[in-house]
Amino acid sequence: LTHQNNSQNSVPKVMVIFPAKNEEGTIENSITTARQSYYKPDVILVDAFSTDKTIQLAEKAGAIVIQQPIKIFPAKGLAMRAGLREAFDRSADIIVFLDADIRNLTPEWVDKLVKALIDDNCDMSRGFYTRHARDAAVTKLIARPMLHTFFPELSHFEQPLSGEVCARRQVWENLLNRENGSSSTPDGWGIDVWFLIEAAISGYHVKEIFMGTKEHTSFEDYREDVSKLSKMAEQVEFTIIREAIKYDRLEMQKKVNV
């Protein structure tokens, strides 16, 4: 990965955010690796009341550690919003989200996501990857089929639930400001697909970036028992349905043969 020559003043202020709960096995290496990016990002850990050594290891690795505002789980949406507010307060120009359980993270993941915004002039970059055949069950069985039905313009996205997402501060601010009444930002697992749908509806150019292979510890928890993903599946499903109602897309289901 090559970069154009930039003066110190022209390099954007990048911040990387890891939402995490009980990720002591990977978090220290993940933070250390992210900080090695060409863009020298500051790192924020949003902790969901971990009971292991996640917080201590994150602080040791040099991260800014904040607490998820409410003690509920799953609450990825809450964590992402808290991380964004912290990044806004610290004057970030570009904000990157990464999953905290990745075993094979490299600095180039951050580089690729940020570089897409700078060089390719897209508004949001999202990672996609080669994954184990039994991985990404919610993506394959819920997210992609439902997007194909209600938001066919998004059906080409390989990983609509990607945890590796990057956008400029103004994009994140605008997306958060779109929430209203019955369509507030999801608190849980629906947040990833919500950001994708809202970004696309807003007219932003969203681009997927190939990151190679993804190896993550959460897959080990559900590879033999996919029912452990039921709460995630439920939240993703209802988020897409709610978005379909909001944007008058329910009629699209009539095109599906049943």
Model-based region annotation:
Residues 2-151, 166-177, 187-202, 206-209, ...:
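Structured catalytic core of nucleotide-sugar glycosyltransferases
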Residues 161, 177-186:
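Conserved nucleotide-sugar donor-binding catalytic segment
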